[in-house]
């Protein structure tokens, strides 16, 4: 699973993700990609599940870029714990995704293959997505 090697703080606030993405909202590396249409947290397990679905569908052809990284720790308290005694321990890592963020990009496969791979990967994610093709200038 993806997680940062080190962070400045162990615990962070749970910010609300709303609005549109100002950066990483266009295709930069690949030729095809999927873009988020809604806001959500995407966990490292969901990112990995999407990556596996894409690589298995294209049968190790092409190059894949993951444009999001889970850099935010989410903490949970143990069940039936009394109030107080601080914040819980970090349990999972999430990436804050806003509408317009590019999630995955792929290069070196046909459009039909890329569309099928991205469709399967989108089923693994908690956001609505759309398939994007790079505009040739």
From Swiss-Prot:
<dbReference type="InterPro" id="IPR036920">
    <property type="entry name" value="Ribosomal_uL16_sf"/>
</dbReference>
<keyword id="KW-0689">Ribosomal protein</keyword>
<dbReference type="Pfam" id="PF00252">
    <property type="entry name" value="Ribosomal_L16"/>
</dbReference>
<dbReference type="InterPro" id="IPR020798">
    <property type="entry name" value="Ribosomal_uL16_CS"/>
</dbReference>
<dbReference type="GO" id="GO:0009507">
    <property type="term" value="C:chloroplast"/>
</dbReference>
<dbReference type="GO" id="GO:0003735">
    <property type="term" value="F:structural constituent of ribosome"/>
</dbReference>
<comment type="similarity">
    <text>Belongs to the universal ribosomal protein uL16 family.</text>
</comment>
<dbReference type="InterPro" id="IPR047873">
    <property type="entry name" value="Ribosomal_uL16"/>
</dbReference>
<keyword id="KW-0934">Plastid</keyword>
<comment type="subunit">
    <text>Part of the 50S ribosomal subunit.</text>
</comment>
<dbReference type="GO" id="GO:0032543">
    <property type="term" value="P:mitochondrial translation"/>
</dbReference>
<protein>
    <recommendedName>
        <fullName>Large ribosomal subunit protein uL16c</fullName>
    </recommendedName>
</protein>
<dbReference type="GO" id="GO:0019843">
    <property type="term" value="F:rRNA binding"/>
</dbReference>
<keyword id="KW-0687">Ribonucleoprotein</keyword>
<dbReference type="InterPro" id="IPR016180">
    <property type="entry name" value="Ribosomal_uL16_dom"/>
</dbReference>
<dbReference type="GO" id="GO:0005762">
    <property type="term" value="C:mitochondrial large ribosomal subunit"/>
</dbReference>
<dbReference type="InterPro" id="IPR000114">
    <property type="entry name" value="Ribosomal_uL16_bact-type"/>
</dbReference>
<keyword id="KW-0150">Chloroplast</keyword>
